[in-house]
Amino acid sequence: MFDSQGEAYKEAFQIFLDHTDQKRNARRWLQQVVDTLPAKRVFIDAGAGNGEVTKAFAGAFARTIAIEPNLYLLKQLQQALPSVEAIALPILTAQPPAQADLVLCSHTFYYIPQDQWLAHLQRLVSWMSPTGVTIVVLQNRETGCMNMLHHFFGHRFDLRRTVEAFQSQQRDRYHVVLTTDPATVDTPDRVKAYAVAEFMLNLLEMKHTPSRRAVEEYLEANFRTQDGRYRIPVHQDFIEIRQGATSRHS
C-alpha cells in the first residue's frame, strides 16, 4: 500500500498524470457547468487534496472553501492558494461557514468506506445553495481500471447504487443527472504502464498484493496495443445534484 506522503506514491501519481487526459477532460466538463451557474458566490471543494482542481475553479468564485483532512496535502494547497479557506476535517465532521453554488467532490470516495458513501453524499448536498449544484466524480464501474481491480480483488467502485439509494430516500426533492465522460491512460511502454497499474490497484487496501508478473501479464493481455503502447480506459462518472424533481442518465 502506497503512503500518500511517500516518494513511490508521488512518482506513480505523477506518471499517471503525465499520461492521462482524465484531469484535463474533467476540468473541461466541470467548466461547462461552472459557466452556466446562476451565481458564483461560494465554491466548496470537498476532499481537495493538494488543490489542483481547486485552483482551476477558485478564480470563478468570490469565496472558496477547501476541505482536506490530510495535513500534508492541505499544506500544499495552502501554499498554492493562500486565499482559500481551509478546513482540516473529514467531510462528515466539517461545517463550512456558507452554502455553496458549487459543491465538488472529485475522486475522493475511493478513500471512504462504501457503507458511508450515502451519508457523505447527503452531507455534501446539505452544503448546496438553493440554486447551486453538487457534483461527485468517480471512475465508471466498467472502466479498464475497475475491471483490473475486480480481476485482482473482486471489487468495483460503483457510485450508481449510492445515487439510487439517495434518490429513493429523497424522492422528488432533487434533480439528479449521471454523465459518463471518456478518458484514457496512454503510456509508451510497460514500465510506465505497470507504475500506473500499481497506483490504481492501491485504491484498495491490499491484504494480498498481486505479483509484478501477474500485473504485467494482465496489462499485456488487456491493454497492450498493436503499436506497443498501453491504453487503459479510465472513464469518469459525473453525478450532478440540484434541487428539483426528475433524474436521467447520459
State the predicted function of each range:
Residues 1-38, 40-49, 133-158:
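Conserved class I S-adenosyl-L-methionine
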Residues 49-93:
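Class I SAM-dependent methyltransferase SAM/SAH-binding core
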Residues 104:
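A conserved beta-strand element that flanks and buttresses the S-adenosyl-L-methionine
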Residues 112-123:
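A short, conserved alpha-helix within the catalytic core of class I
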Residues 156-171:
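Short alpha-helix
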Residues 175-248:
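Conserved Class I S-adenosyl-L-methionine
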